[in-house]
């Protein structure tokens, strides 16, 4: 299988926040932003694998600043790492105030997707071609996150087998 470059599947999606997106506190509801993060990441995973993909985990989602009605959000999504059937996508969310021009980094997330064949089973994905120093750094960090996720999963399985071993 031929490798693919990160820039060939990366996307930036722009969306203006509207009154229907607001929570009772007057900020854009976090769930609205989460859905758009998942959508942007899914586009990247599907562009890389050229098949259906499913979100299997959100490793981390951090909200840094509130988002308001009228803000133009940019969801910048790109692959960080691929495994045999899985892909980690990083998403950076920036909000632009259309009146002042101020741009704020409002959220970041890491999502893992699995590619599916026509029968809904995991299928192999193309290898990732990592070119720039930034891509290499993000790839290393993604591999570290993957190792931590696998260790956590192993610990959870052990706890289910022997609840007394978990304190």
Where are these regions (language model features)?
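N-terminal glycine-rich phosphate/pyrophosphate-binding loops that anchor nucleotide-derived ligands
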Residues: 2-4
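Hydrophobic beta-strand-centered segment that forms part of the acyl-chain substrate-binding groove
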Residues: 6-8, 28, 39-76, 80-82, ...
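HotDog/MaoC-like acyl-thioester-processing domains
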Residues: 7-13, 68-69, 80-167
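Residue-level recognition of specific faces of alpha-helices
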Residues: 14, 33, 57-60
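A conserved, well-ordered hydrophobic junction motif at loop->secondary-structure transitions
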Residues: 22-35, 166-167
């Amino acid at each position: 299988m031929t490798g693919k470059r990160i820039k060939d599947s990366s996307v930036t999606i722009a969306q203006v926040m509207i009154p229907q997106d607001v929570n009772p506190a007057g900020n854009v509801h976090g769930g609205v932003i989460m859905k758009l993060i998942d959508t942007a990441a899914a586009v990247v995973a599907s562009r890389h694998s050229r098949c259906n993909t499913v979100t299997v985990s959100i490793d981390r989602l951090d909200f840094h600043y509130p988002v308001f009605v009228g803000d133009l959000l940019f969801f910048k999504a790109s692959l960080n790492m691929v495994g045999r059937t899985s892909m980690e996508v990083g998403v950076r969310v920036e909000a632009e105030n259309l009146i002042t021009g101020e741009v704020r980094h409002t959220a970041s997330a890491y999502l893992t997707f699995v590619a599916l064949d026509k029968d809904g089973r995991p299928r192999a994905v193309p290898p990732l071609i990592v070119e720039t120093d930034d891509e290499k750094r993000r790839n290393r960090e993604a591999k570290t996150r993957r190792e931590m996720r696998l260790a956590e999963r192993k610990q959870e399985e052990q706890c289910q087998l022997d609840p007394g071993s978990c304190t």
